[in-house]
Amino acid sequence: ALLDSLEIESVFVFGSSGGGPSAIEFAILYPEITKGLISYEALTKSWVNRPDGAESLSKQSDFQLWYIFKIAELMGIETMVSFLMPNPINQEKVLINETQSNKFKDNFWSIWPMSLRKEGYENDFKNYLNLSLSLEKISVPTIAIHGDEDINVNISHSKELSSKVKNSKIYVIKGADHFMHFSHNKEIKESLDTFIRDNVKSSY
């Protein structure tokens, strides 16, 4: 209904991390208007290997989370980056780029205040534990992009997708983690541009 009201005839669907299941379901339900599916470090099956502490975020009060984040911020951008990115090489890629550093800082704070997100956050955790998607029903061109050092969403999720979708391919970014859009943004953009360009051409 939204696409109809906006008079948009076709789309590329992008699903990142926990947004992957929604994008996948859209591609399955509306193949006639989906030019391509982009699965970006996305969940495609049950999320059993969760990172330590992820679920406890929703248990923190707004003040507690603000205090933790503020201490990290006062300690400097280096601390904020190392808090989420374990690989020193990736940390350096972010720190030497002021634009990416500022974007990273904004992303760091994006889950606060948790009180506005708590209900949805906990609902996601519950649903992702027993996630079951009919991946074999995806018929549109599909690309799965994933870093091989992602400890938040294991690369096995993208491998699962690419193994079950006939018209698909997987693009693995070496040395990249779940925050690779800050450290490997150029490589990611190039892979996305190529996928979209190729599938726009093929539709004519």
Name every feature range the model reports, one short phrase each.
Residues 1-11:
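Conserved acidic catalytic loop of the alpha/beta-hydrolase fold
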Residues 13-15, 40, 145:
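Short beta-strand immediately N-terminal to the catalytic nucleophile in serine-hydrolase-like folds
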Residues 15-19, 23:
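Gly/Ala-rich beta-loop-alpha elbow adjacent to hydrolase catalytic centers
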Residues 37-69:
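Flexible "cap/lid" loop of the alpha/beta hydrolase fold
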Residues 57-60, 67-134:
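Alpha/beta-hydrolase
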Residues 138, 144-146, 150:
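Short beta-strand/loop motif that positions the catalytic acidic residue
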Residues 151-157:
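Conserved alpha/beta-hydrolase "acid-adjacent" motif
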Residues 168-204:
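Catalytic active-site module of serine/aspartate enzymes centered on a nucleophile-bearing elbow/loop
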